[in-house]
């Protein structure tokens, strides 16, 4: 789907729980100030104060799902020293307590969320997106944390 600001509810940023230390970073509540994205027309739409959720994928070591929420703190910019399409977007990330995280199973159980792009195209590059309807459904699950 072509994303436009007219039907963007929030961004969905992804981390691979099997190939990264994201579980350890979440356990320590590490402050994360930037996230890697791949330059596209979508990154050109990214701007400060837009909401996002962090989706952690994985099968072996982590429970996949939404682990954090936050807002973008600026536009996506070229990652210094990187070549190609790699960019970084500044973020203000807030880790969710483990009991509040929304697992992939819980997302699939909610008919309002079953069509998330991250479920339909799990290998797609960062960023993914949520519609306003998806955001309303997620807020039902994550309130008052988000």
Predicted regions and their residues:
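Short basic/aromatic-enriched segments
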Residues: 58-64
